[in-house]
C-alpha cells in the first residue's frame, strides 16, 4: 500500500480499517425537480396553526379563568379589609 487510497475507496468502519472493496451497494436519490419541500407550506401554516390553537384553547382558557377569578376575589377582599366596614374583620384576621 504505497500512498493514500483513492477518495472513493471504502476503508472500513472504525476499528477495522482496510477491509475488502464493497460490492453491490446501490444508492437511490430523488430528483431535486421532483421534490417540492415547501409545497403548500404557507397554506398549511395558516390552517394548521388555527387547528392547533383551537385544540389547545380550553387547556389555556380554563386555568386562566380560574386564576383570574381567584385573583380578583383576593384583590376585592383586600380592598374591603382596608375600608371603614372591613377594619373590624381585619383586626380579627390579624390576630
Curated annotation (Swiss-Prot):
Gene disruption phenotype: Leads to decreased vegetative growth on several carbon sources including maltose, citrate and acetate.
GO MF terms held by the record: ubiquinol-cytochrome-c reductase activity
Pfam family, one: UcrQ
Protein induction: Expression is up-regulated in cells that undergo morphogenesis to form pseudohyphal cells when co-incubated with macrophages. The promoter contains the conserved motif 5'-TGAAAA(G/T)GAAG-3' found in morphogenesis up-regulated genes involved in energy generation including ATP2, ATP3, ATP4, ATP20, QCR8, COX4, and SDH1. Expression is repressed during formation os spider biofilm. Expression is repressed by HAP43.
Any GO CC annotation of this UniProt entry: respiratory chain complex III
Compartments where found: Membrane; Mitochondrion inner membrane
GO biological process: mitochondrial electron transport, ubiquinol to cytochrome c
Membrane topology value: Single-pass membrane protein
Membrane-spanning ranges: 57-74
Keywords associated with the record: Electron transport, Membrane, Mitochondrion, Mitochondrion inner membrane, Respiratory chain, Transmembrane, Transmembrane helix, Transport
Protein family (similarity comment): Belongs to the UQCRQ/QCR8 family.
Subunit structure: Component of the ubiquinol-cytochrome c oxidoreductase (cytochrome b-c1 complex, complex III, CIII), a multisubunit enzyme composed of 10 subunits. The complex is composed of 3 respiratory subunits cytochrome b (COB), cytochrome c1 (CYT1) and Rieske protein (RIP1), 2 core protein subunits COR1 and QCR2, and 5 low-molecular weight protein subunits QCR6, QCR7, QCR8, QCR9 and QCR10.
Primary role: Component of the ubiquinol-cytochrome c oxidoreductase, a multisubunit transmembrane complex that is part of the mitochondrial electron transport chain which drives oxidative phosphorylation. The complex plays an important role in the uptake of multiple carbon sources present in different host niches.
Protein's name in the database: Cytochrome b-c1 complex subunit 8, mitochondrial
Native species: Candida albicans (strain SC5314 / ATCC MYA-2876)
Lineage: Eukaryota, Fungi, Dikarya, Ascomycota, Saccharomycotina
Gene of this entry: QCR8
Amino acid at each position: 500500500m504505497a500512498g493514500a487510497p483513492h477518495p472513493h475507496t471504502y476503508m472500513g468502519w472504525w476499528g477495522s480499517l482496510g477491509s475488502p472493496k464493497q460490492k453491490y451497494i446501490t444508492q437511490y436519490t430523488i430528483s431535486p425537480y421532483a421534490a417540492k419541500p415547501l409545497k403548500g407550506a404557507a397554506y398549511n401554516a395558516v390552517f394548521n396553526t388555527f387547528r392547533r390553537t383551537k385544540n389547545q384553547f380550553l387547556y389555556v382558557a380554563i386555568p386562566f379563568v380560574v386564576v383570574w377569578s381567584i385573583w380578583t376575589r383576593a384583590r376585592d377582599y383586600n380592598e374591603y379589609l382596608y375600608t371603614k366596614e372591613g377594619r373590624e374583620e381585619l383586626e380579627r384576621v390579624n390576630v
